């Protein structure tokens, strides 16, 4: 074993040295593990976070003494070593110590051309990255003696001194430059965006150079043993003769493939012993480092050197497969596999994604409200979208904002783009429920509906029928049809979900409005439906006409007649829902929206309605104007409709109970959950409950069948949260509707907040968009008060949230800590929510095991 050198400022990377990722960074620790495994790693020295911070402040280590650790005045490289691989760092600098004398020595040993190329590359990198000179001054053609002389002259001309010849000075300047780059404002902001703390430290690794250039078999390459896209076993990478670093990855036709390939020569054919040795190293790393690694290597005169190893780059899909495979092979535990998959990354597996290898012509940006990507023709109206869909043409519904009237157009479209809106706007909520990629709040665009043109910030415009791509994952709109990657709901995904379900200790339900939504919820193993919005069932053409007849009825008898015709349709929907869910709980929210949402807009729509109802246009117009409200969100909707027009809730309750009897007769017993929306007072619950109980009693008598049901309240007004104790006395459950509760608590419109929300978050007014992440201080306090007061009166009451916050990992953490029984979110967010909940359980008592070296 080599003698250990341990100085105050730096530590030789040897098997027994005191090196830790928390003090020296992941790269230093990984190199030590490679040394312990017996891999051929060039001599390396680690500088701690503390040392690098001191260097940034002006205290330099004794670099001459540091260089004395290396044999025979070797050239060295400096590599960054942050605590987390994702946090990045300054770029690696190679060939430190290169000067006139070393150039002459290398020319004798390896030839003039190789030595000149090394020297020129170092002068260029040192001048631009260390001395911070203009890169244009050092652009050259052929790397020959003339180019080297010109580069040295350019440096001397800019710096008023010759290029430094002292290796110790070169190393000092490189260390200072990299340390200060890490401490810079832009670098700090960049790593904070990746989750690093503001005071995250940087270590540096000084490593002897394995040249990769010279006589004999020389070159450099990168190898990994799994596919970056799928995670399946596959040797990938490139090797470039007479090269250094990662040059092989950008070398084009000059680089060798690694395995035999019909497209050209390979490392396996040219250097079979080197290839076989790399495969052995890969197997050792996987088993002992407990990870799939990417290895950077150099071949120097036929000898293989391993310079670096990092976790293999991977897509979210590949990460799931890799984590599951490592657990299946007994290398890591199932719990570790779960913790290695970020919950939010699952969104990329559930929807098509833009191929990261393709070109992105971004024409607009907004809020990525529903993940995934889709390409299609622009459609400015729901009618146009339906027409295109009927012809088999994928289309993108482009609207200033969507309303319930656009439901059919959204069903016909493959994606949605709106100028206005935020994370809980109509387009966002429905988009997530339908699994449609959706970008909202794209305030830089302008839609001219009359001219049927979409204008984007760079001056271009798109007409109806033009093709665009919507990337709801990144919140971008792209010109044309770009290449997409298909979803990856394979066996490994389902295995990971099964492991998460075994750990998860809070219920995960889905928001589902139709039988199709329920089938999707079942496909993701949701534990029930936490929110079924019944109003979405009324927008089909035949039902919409009946709804409008009911709205324009002159008497209660006429309203009841129209509702009587809607009853079998609603009952059939509920029978389907109950049958699909097979005895799992289904929570049905009674009718909620204001009635005017079911009326057409514009004179032509009103005229068609007058024809359909056989009434004068003037009467239709007058009644429509009378239904209009100044602030419909706070107007005649929810329980207020149920009290003033009780026939609506009577019909819905009867449909639910008759469906319960029918579905229970042919399948698993059904215990429906009925939820009253927009409650703010105990008396509202009492009035609605008495009528629903009466309907239930009538159905029991008529059908001769007994059944049970649960009645609860959707807590979405601040007053309902504050008075939850007295409301709980009449409720089996309290489900917090956090979308509207956030709106009312903040006094914000979710449809308009996107116009200023980014500025508010950037300026620190809000830490996060409160429509995206549950506000723990304001809205969260109302949830805690409501939960506490509700359970103080009724300890067994069920508590949940059913707003879109239910699929957010941070919000799930809040609900779990508050003792909620379940969360409910859109079907496509169920896998994300389940994994996030599993993470919370595992993180409470888990520490990640170290590598086995």
Can you name each region flagged by the protein language model?
Residues 279-285, 438, 784-789:
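Metal-dependent nuclease catalytic cores in nucleic-acid-processing enzymes
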Residues 303-305, 403-411, 415, 423-429, ...:
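Glycine-rich phosphate/ribose-binding loops and adjacent secondary-structure elements
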Residues 398-400, 419, 441, 511, ...:
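Structural motif
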Residues 489-492, 499-853:
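Conserved alpha/beta-domain cores
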